[in-house]
């Protein structure tokens, strides 16, 4: 089965990084799902997060399920967490929360693992990237479960400007001048008088830029500076959002990958992965 079969595309995710999950075993996915279901329904005590959250109390949890996929020659192993639930205010509508856990897209050396004091053998698993799409209150509870059950740290995956540029290179090689939608780029400044700058480039103009075999971004920066005297390469400006016909990525870790990008999704997710194992 492909990611498309799991409704992966055309929805917005928030990206996270996880430290190794200790005591996690693929052979125990059914039991882990049952534990999470019980945790979401009843919590661990009667005075904790669950009874204090009115928003979470509105959720009626049906079931949490972990499923293993991937591990092929073209795609690494990944897990999918599905949580089905209703809300007390609307019992007629079935809702679902999703989380994808991806193992490393690149092979780390044993030296790197030793240096970062991470043992990837035995009953610990390292997921380099997790993509979450679920109600905020539900996610807080799932995060708490993973931290308590597997002694893992979960951190927001902020997307640096360099990674956004890497995605633009991947996108340029993929579209081959065939895009029918404009490209939209946004830079933030941190200056209250000019908080952000957004530029939209029409498809016909993109085709002209793409005639060159080189990366279009430096050419675009020169053109903008020449026409507007605005130097977007200045350190004051930080690329914060890339909106293409294949995917939307933001520096805050939000991303939406469209079904058109199926043949580059591996490269896009690889670009989000850290170049070396992080230290926790």
From Swiss-Prot:
<dbReference type="GO" id="GO:0000776">
    <property type="term" value="C:kinetochore"/>
</dbReference>
<keyword id="KW-0132">Cell division</keyword>
<comment type="function">
    <text>Component of the kinetochore, a multiprotein complex that assembles on centromeric DNA and attaches chromosomes to spindle microtubules, mediating chromosome segregation and sister chromatid segregation during meiosis and mitosis. Component of the inner kinetochore constitutive centromere-associated network (CCAN), which serves as a structural platform for outer kinetochore assembly.</text>
</comment>
<comment type="subunit">
    <text>Component of the inner kinetochore constitutive centromere-associated network (CCAN) (also known as central kinetochore Sim4 complex in fission yeast), which is composed of at least cnl2, cnp3, cnp20, fta1, fta2, fta3, fta4, fta6, fta7, mal2, mhf1, mhf2, mis6, mis15, mis17, sim4 and wip1.</text>
</comment>
<keyword id="KW-0995">Kinetochore</keyword>
<dbReference type="GO" id="GO:0031511">
    <property type="term" value="C:Mis6-Sim4 complex"/>
</dbReference>
<dbReference type="GO" id="GO:0005874">
    <property type="term" value="C:microtubule"/>
</dbReference>
<dbReference type="GO" id="GO:0005634">
    <property type="term" value="C:nucleus"/>
</dbReference>
<keyword id="KW-0539">Nucleus</keyword>
<keyword id="KW-0131">Cell cycle</keyword>
<keyword id="KW-0159">Chromosome partition</keyword>
<dbReference type="InterPro" id="IPR025204">
    <property type="entry name" value="CENP-L"/>
</dbReference>
<keyword id="KW-0137">Centromere</keyword>
<keyword id="KW-0158">Chromosome</keyword>
<dbReference type="GO" id="GO:0051315">
    <property type="term" value="P:attachment of mitotic spindle microtubules to kinetochore"/>
</dbReference>
<dbReference type="GO" id="GO:0051455">
    <property type="term" value="P:spindle attachment to meiosis I kinetochore"/>
</dbReference>
<keyword id="KW-0493">Microtubule</keyword>
<protein>
    <recommendedName>
        <fullName>Inner kinetochore subunit fta1</fullName>
    </recommendedName>
</protein>
<dbReference type="Pfam" id="PF13092">
    <property type="entry name" value="CENP-L"/>
</dbReference>
<comment type="similarity">
    <text>Belongs to the CENP-L/IML3 family.</text>
</comment>
<keyword id="KW-0498">Mitosis</keyword>
<dbReference type="GO" id="GO:0051301">
    <property type="term" value="P:cell division"/>
</dbReference>
């Amino acid at each position: 089965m492909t990611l498309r079969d799991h409704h992966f595309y055309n929805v917005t995710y928030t990206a996270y990084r996880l430290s190794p999950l200790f005591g996690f075993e693929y052979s125990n996915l059914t039991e882990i799902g049952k534990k999470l279901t019980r945790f979401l329904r009843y919590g661990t005590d009667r005075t904790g997060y669950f009874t204090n959250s009115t928003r979470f109390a509105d959720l009626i949890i049906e079931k949490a399920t972990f499923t293993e996929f991937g591990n092929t020659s073209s795609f690494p192993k990944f897990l999918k967490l599905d949580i089905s639930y209703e809300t007390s205010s609307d019992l007629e509508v079935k809702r679902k929360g999703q989380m994808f856990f991806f193992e490393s897209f690149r092979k780390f050396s044993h030296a790197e693992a030793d240096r970062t004091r991470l043992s990837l053998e035995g009953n610990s698993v390292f997921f380099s990237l997790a993509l979450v799409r679920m109600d905020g209150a539900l996610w807080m509870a799932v995060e708490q479960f993973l931290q308590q059950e597997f002694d893992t740290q979960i951190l927001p995956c902020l997307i640096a400007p360099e990674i956004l540029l890497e995605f633009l290179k991947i996108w340029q090689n993929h579209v081959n001048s065939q895009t029918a939608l404009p490209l939209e780029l946004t830079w933030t400044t941190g200056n209250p008088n000019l908080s952000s700058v957004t530029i939209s480039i029409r498809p016909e103009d993109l085709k002209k830029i793409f005639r060159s075999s080189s990366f279009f971004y430096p050419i675009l920066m020169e053109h903008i500076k020449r026409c507007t005297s605005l130097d977007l390469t200045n350190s004051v400006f930080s690329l914060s959002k890339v909106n293409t016909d294949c995917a939307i990525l933001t520096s805050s870790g939000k991303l939406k990958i469209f079904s058109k990008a199926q043949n580059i999704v591996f490269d896009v997710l690889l670009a989000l992965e850290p170049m070396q194992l992080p230290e926790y």
